[in-house]
């Protein structure tokens, strides 16, 4: 009986530590299933062969990541036939504009962290709006900043609004629309622009267009200022998150492309290229984590969200200043 119990325990340990892996000899079968699941169509046989080669490399990378004893799991998703360069150039968008401005007030946060709850998530208070999909337009900077304002509005008024990213893409004359932008310059341009309109008045097209504001739209929010935060201790982000609401932040998205679920520990940090929204934090199985809202649709990650381990500068999350807007509630 004792031997049976020991065998069961060993089997459980092996199962717990088993890393999910794709059989590379079945790459062709996986690829055909992938094509069917995501309705992928290619121009010719040559392109299909090239995409299959990238797909094979993706499988190898996924298997490698799943062997790292990370608590995250990586799987085939809609990006599996795209190179990293394609993904970063089309589906992220954090990029230095030709012109730069700095109207935001800089605040240095160097005090010891305060005492707050072990777990906190603005979603549990219904203060985070729905997941969006930027598609092949490098406008993450617009999505992340507007998502933070949508949350501020929900915190203040207990109502969800859906702001127009296309307004920012077309009418922000400092950032570069689908070719990229920065968080603080987006906030600064909102100040110059006046009121922000909702999605139904200025629908998302996912391409650069001339500004189509007519002047008779009904603005719902006006930004009157912005802050940039120098955070010396990652732990202080908890206090900031609870105080100002969800925070747009810059990361290196290279390591999250094939993410499926769990807490990411090993994450590339070679250069910031994507903007996401910090919405919460917590602890799972003694692993402290941050929760971020992404803009790659609900069919990616944990229904559009991902988690990274705290206090390891995962994905370079503390390499750039965090930002927030000051809303004119009297407008």
UniProtKB/Swiss-Prot annotation:
Belongs to the peptidase C1 family. It catalyses: Endopeptidase of broad specificity, hydrolyzing substrates of both cathepsin L and cathepsin B. Disulfide bonds join 137-178, 171-211, 267-315. It comes from Buzura suppressaria nuclear polyhedrosis virus. Residues 1-21 form the signal peptide. It is an enzyme of class 3 (hydrolase). This is Viral cathepsin. Keywords: Disulfide bond, Hydrolase, Protease, Signal, Thiol protease, Zymogen. The active site is at residues 140, 274, 294. It comes from the Viruses. Synthesized as an inactive proenzyme and activated by proteolytic removal of the inhibitory propeptide. InterPro entries: Papain-like_cys_pep_sf (IPR038765), Pept_asp_AS (IPR025661), Pept_cys_AS (IPR000169), Pept_his_AS (IPR025660), Peptidase_C1A (IPR013128), Peptidase_C1A_C (IPR000668), Peptidase_C1A_papain-like (IPR039417), Prot_inhib_I29 (IPR013201). PROSITE patterns: THIOL_PROTEASE_ASN, THIOL_PROTEASE_CYS, THIOL_PROTEASE_HIS. GO terms for molecular function: cysteine-type peptidase activity. Residues 22-116 form a propeptide.
């Amino acid at each position: 009986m004792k031997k049976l119990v020991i065998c069961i325990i060993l089997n459980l340990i092996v199962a717990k530590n088993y890393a999910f892996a794709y059989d590379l000899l079945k790459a062709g079968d996986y690829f055909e299933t992938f094509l069917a699941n995501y309705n992928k169509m290619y121009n010719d046989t040559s392109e299909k062969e090239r995409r299959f080669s990238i797909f094979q490399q993706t499988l190898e990378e996924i298997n490698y990541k799943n062997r790292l004893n990370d608590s995250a799991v990586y799987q085939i998703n809609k990006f599996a036939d795209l190179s990293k360069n394609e993904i970063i150039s089309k589906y992220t968008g954090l990029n230095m504009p030709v012109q730069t401005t700095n109207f935001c007030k800089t605040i240095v946060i160097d005090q010891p962290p305060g005492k707050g709850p072990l777990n906190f998530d603005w979603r549990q208070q219904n203060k985070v709006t729905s997941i969006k999909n930027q598609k092949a337009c490098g406008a993450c900077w617009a999505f992340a900043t507007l998502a933070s304002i949508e949350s501020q509005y929900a915190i203040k008024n207990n109502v969800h609004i859906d702001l127009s990213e296309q307004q920012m893409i077309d009418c922000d004359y400092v950032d570069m629309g689908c070719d990229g932008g920065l968080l603080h310059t987006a906030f600064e341009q909102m100040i110059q622009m006046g009121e922000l309109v909702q999605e139904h008045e200025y629908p998302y097209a996912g391409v650069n267009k001339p500004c189509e504001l007519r002047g008779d739209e009904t603005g719902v929010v006006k930004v009157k200022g912005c802050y940039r935060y120098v955070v010396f201790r990652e732990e202080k982000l908890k206090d900031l998150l609870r105080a100002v609401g969800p925070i747009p932040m810059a990361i290196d998205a290279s390591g999250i492309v094939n993410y499926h679920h769990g807490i990411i520990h090993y994450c590339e940090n070679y250069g910031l290229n994507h903007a996401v929204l910090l919405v919460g934090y917590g602890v799972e199985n003694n692993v402290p984590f941050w929760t971020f809202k992404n803009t790659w649709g609900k069919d990616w990650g944990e229904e559009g969200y991902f988690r990274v381990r705290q206090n390891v500068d995962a994905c370079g999350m503390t390499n750039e200043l965090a930002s927030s807007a000051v809303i004119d509630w009297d407008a």
